[in-house]
Amino acid sequence: MTEKEKMLAEKWYDANFDQDLINERARAKDICFELNHTKPSDTNKRKELIDQLFQTTTDNVSISIPFDTDYGWNVKLGKNVYVNTNCYFMDGGQITIGDNVFIGPNCGFYTATHPLNFYHRNEGYEKAGPIHIGSNTWFGGHVAVLPGVTIGEGSVIGAGSVVTKDIPPHSLAVGNPCKVVRKIDNDLPSETLNDETIK
């Protein structure tokens, strides 16, 4: 198996010294650099760069700068996704994001883990676990999502949370480690919106 194949199979792989992966990361970093230095008002150029980065035709995806990702092609974005400023997608493992997702500033989605033994860690070994984000979710600022986590549809993750385990659908979850506080009633029609129902 190539190191890339090992990475995608969630096996230990050489993340630091494999030239093919180094080249793929360099490609993504160059596109991120260009995106981060493109005027926010130049929406056509930004759309072109975003599609080039993720190697797909995105549908109403908005990314505020600065933004960073390792590969880009291993992020699968739904429709109507908003990524606020200074977010990082560590996408050695696949990051799947559903439709209508709001991501606050300074959020990180980290699929990589390293050996605890420093001899192996210093040899460049790494393993990547996928992250799955359901549709209609919202992340407050400074949220960290760790490898292997699934966050269910319609959930809200409070600011500053560190998500180490799966979050069920329609949950309000906060903290370090992130824990469910209560369920969210996502069946309320929009006309009932007021100071009580907006909580």
Curated annotation (Swiss-Prot):
One of its GO terms (molecular function) is galactoside O-acetyltransferase activity. Belongs to the transferase hexapeptide repeat family. PANTHER family: ACETYLTRANSFERASE YJL218W-RELATED (PTHR43017:SF1), GALACTOSIDE O-ACETYLTRANSFERASE (PTHR43017). SUPFAM superfamilies: Trimeric LpxA-like enzymes (SSF51161). InterPro entries: Hexapep, LacA-like, Mac_dom, Trimer_LpxA-like_sf. Keywords: Acyltransferase, Repeat, Transferase. Pfam families: Hexapep (PF00132), Hexapep_2 (PF14602), Mac (PF12464). Its EC number is 2.3.1.-. It comes from the Bacteria. It comes from Staphylococcus aureus (strain Mu50 / ATCC 700699). The lineage of its organism: Bacteria, Bacillati, Bacillota, Bacilli, Bacillales. Disulfide bonds: none annotated. This is Putative acetyltransferase SAV2555.
